[in-house]
Amino acid sequence: MRSYRTTRRAVGLLAAAALGTGLLSACASDDDDGSKSDSGDGGSGKTTITMGLFGTFGFEEAGLYDEYEKLNPDITIKQDVIERNENYYPALLNHLTSNSGLADVQAIEVANIAEVVDTQADRFMDLGKVDGASEDAFLDWKWQQATADDGKTIGLGTDVGPMAVCYRKDHFEAAGLPTDREEVAELWAGDWEKFLDAGRDFKENGPEGVAWVDSADAVYDGAIASSEGKYYDEAGEVIYKDSPDVEAAWGIASTAAEEKLTGNLEQFTKQWDQAMSNGDFATISCPAWMLGYIQEKGGTKAEGKWDVAQSPRPGNWGGSFLGVPESGPNKDEAAKLVAWLTAPEQQAKLFAERGNFPSAPPAYDMEAVRTATNPYFGDAPIGELFSASAEEIPVQTIGPKDQVIDDNIGNGLQLIEQGKQDPDGAWDEAVKAVDNALDQ
């Protein structure tokens, strides 16, 4: 599978499972088509603000729409949800190009934000100038991702995906590895090579039939997410072939595949879901939203067996934005709504109810975030853990075709896991596929 919310790497943002008592994963389930989907006002005379979304952002489920309507009695909010970003995003581009059929508010996934900023910025309002929206309230790199060279900010961040590693305590114990989350984090602190070393120990001493990690692709995702560089330079040139960060992440992931430390699974497939349910792997790269997915697939039989530790290095995987098209009939009111929905207070409420990790650092000191724990994961202090990770995430240059490059690198890693190519041959195949996709 290529995409649910954006691709297999972003699909977890759709997972709709409880994160402890009331906490759910970021952007929840792709089964929800939105109960507030019509855009009429029924003759009430109220201003109806339409929200064009993909997946489930959780605003309605967390009660934020109802709260805003009570604060603003002349406003009605209706959302129109397309389940998968692979269907939503092409339609959004078509509407932007024709300048018709747009909702008052349109969501943009992080994998697409660079392309929208580069090619469609003139179609959106500058939300940096809207009352209630402050650059200082957001992570700097998150704000910059949606800001054009001329300083126009076309979207406000809804969430981010700070990284951790989720691990099975029962499997670690059986392999003679520590199970305390702080001691576990020390196994690989600061270095993904140490993560492989722990995996080698696990392979030698762990339970038969249990892989160290689910997939080489997930190892790569974690490693590249924690790197300074990625696929483009600041001038917008594609540099992945010569990037030392990509080379290092590929080296870590391809080694994991070649040494058979992985479960040879493709994330967000039925086979992967079943393996998670059965406990067939011991670790997984774990952004905040992944916790809910693990809980959903692990069910009651895995409760208390999983825990969460800091990743080898801080990184980010996931996150979205809300933008306001210039052609919208209610753009001023829509901009006010977007500023309110993405304010730290609302982001903290959304985390408490749905698990979407805030892109606004002021929310990290709020009790709903700061004291959050997850009973399913042994009362892991997820608010504290993910806040610390979020504040240390490296700033990466996001390019317009990051997802295309990412997908084809993942396909190359699968060739190694399947025994079809060695790492050098798999890299060559990945490069050919990327170059074809980019017409190079």
Kindly give the residue locations of the regions a language model identified.
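Periplasmic solute-binding protein
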Residues: A114-T119, W143-E183, S215-A235, W317-V324, ...
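Hinge/lid segment of periplasmic solute-binding proteins
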Residues: E109-A164, E303-D307, T373
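Short, solvent-exposed loop/beta-turn-alpha elements that line the ligand-binding surface or hinge
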Residues: G128-F138, E182-A189, G229-A248, E296-K301, ...
